[in-house]
Amino acid sequence: SVGFKAGVKEYKLTYYTPEYETKDTDILAAFRVTPQPGVPPEEAGXAVXXESSTGTWTAVWTDGLTSLDRYKGRCYXIEPVPGEEDQYIAYVAYPLDXFEEGSVTNMFTSIVGNVFGFKALXALRLEDLRIPPAYIKTFEGPPHGIQVERDKLNKYGRPLLXCTIKPKLGLSAKNYGRACYECLRGGLDFTKDDENVNSQPFMRWRDRFLFCAEAIYKAQAETGEIKGHYLNATAGTCEEMIKRAVFARELGVPIVMHDYLTGGFTANTSLAHYCRDNGLLLHIHRAMHAVIDRQKNHGIHFRVLAKALRMSGGDHIHSGTVVGKLEGERDITLGFVDLLRDDFIEKDRSRGIYFTQDWSSLPGVLPVXSGGIHVXHMPALTEIFGDDSVXXFGGGTLGHPWGNAPGAVANRVSLEACVKARNEGRDLAAEGNEIIREASKWSPELAAACEVWKEIRFNFAAVDTLDPS
């Protein structure tokens, strides 16, 4: 019959197109789909494509007023996941016109919006995204990037060192600033606000900013090195967040910080633009990420959240440690660390990378390894992450038996020893303990640190693992 035909039709008739050849401008997504019993994979894959682009559950007459072929998502390949019954990777291509330029928020609202509550799927996880250069060019990305940061700080050829000030809640501003000063004076490059330090009754943000700035200037004067403190500008409103960033700029400090998932991508991108315009570096904390990324069969993989952050903007981001107390398997972690730092990353399923990603010269982001690490981990961290990283030791600095400054000294000595050994061609993986032991002979601070933490290990299997290939 001619004209509009009402009724429900199968998704796969419109949205499953195995013959489709992807375009260079398409955004490509890899979803891990677990269909409900009785739902064929083609129907499930097509449903993902439909519900995250143009589709609705029934035919509507306004479909006739547009060109579905131009705007619809297409499921173009489905492959079973090895070792899993009834789980598939569905590849979906989205036309570029379906997204607003320069908006991570809009990209996520489409791709990971309502579709995650869809009844025909038992579970759904976004494993990876291929962002085309045409879309990347609409983002400003990190305010400065790795090279500019090194030039600003005048620090080359080694990872940077930081320390989160603990206890995270309850210190007064003056005592907090004192802890910052001691760590910076001892040899760290940065100290850091904890992610949940914003502006609470025991320490309002303005007081904290002032005392931390004092600590920075005092430590700089005494060490001759450039120092910084990640001043957390995260706030309840965007206006308040920018107000805090403005005050940081007026104090002349080098870096501010934001919790990008709890604060949201819109706020984060606004802050990144402000930081670029005003010469502030931007440190990003990923609080709430595990809510989204920890389950293997549902949610969004962190490599996607990391790509989104590079688009939205940030100069540092926490990225797991491989060796500390928080989640992170080595190959997977190194996969998204490369996605953060490098300009071109080849598809590599052994590291969980589903697509080749070309960043077309968008600046890189420094990965921050933090969480349960201490001096004995330094050889492994130096070997795994290389020079372009920040290693943040909170308890691993402040927990030193002699105090904060000696804790900082121990970290700096162990780092310099590892970098020196590596530059001399020694194998950090094999000789790490020996390198630290040698250095501790002439550094009593390091020897004391080794004595305290020599037996500490967080040995649990990672929850998020690679599929058997």
UniProtKB/Swiss-Prot annotation:
Record PTM N6,N6,N6-trimethyllysine, positions in chain: K5
E.C. numbers: 4.1.1.39
Keyword Plastid on entry: yes
Residues at the catalytic site: K166 (proton acceptor), H285 (proton acceptor)
Maturation and modification: The disulfide bond which can form in the large chain dimeric partners within the hexadecamer appears to be associated with oxidative stress and protein turnover.
Molecular functions (GO terms): magnesium ion binding; monooxygenase activity; ribulose-bisphosphate carboxylase activity
Enzyme class: lyase
GO BP annotation list: photorespiration; reductive pentose-phosphate cycle
Marked site (Transition state stabilizer) residue numbers: K325
Residue(s) carrying N6-carboxylysine: K192
Coiled coil: none
Cofactor, free-text remark: Binds 1 Mg(2+) ion per subunit.
UniProt entry tagged with the keyword Membrane: no
Anything else known: The basic functional RuBisCO is composed of a large chain homodimer in a 'head-to-tail' conformation. In form I RuBisCO this homodimer is arranged in a barrel-like tetramer with the small subunits forming a tetrameric 'cap' on each end of the 'barrel'.
Family as reported in the entry's similarity comment: Belongs to the RuBisCO large chain family. Type I subfamily.
Subunit and interaction comment: Heterohexadecamer of 8 large chains and 8 small chains; disulfide-linked. The disulfide link is formed within the large subunit homodimers.
Protein name per Swiss-Prot or TrEMBL: Ribulose bisphosphate carboxylase large chain
Organism: Calycophyllum candidissimum (Degame lemonwood tree)
Upper classification of the organism: Eukaryota, Viridiplantae, Streptophyta, Embryophyta, Tracheophyta
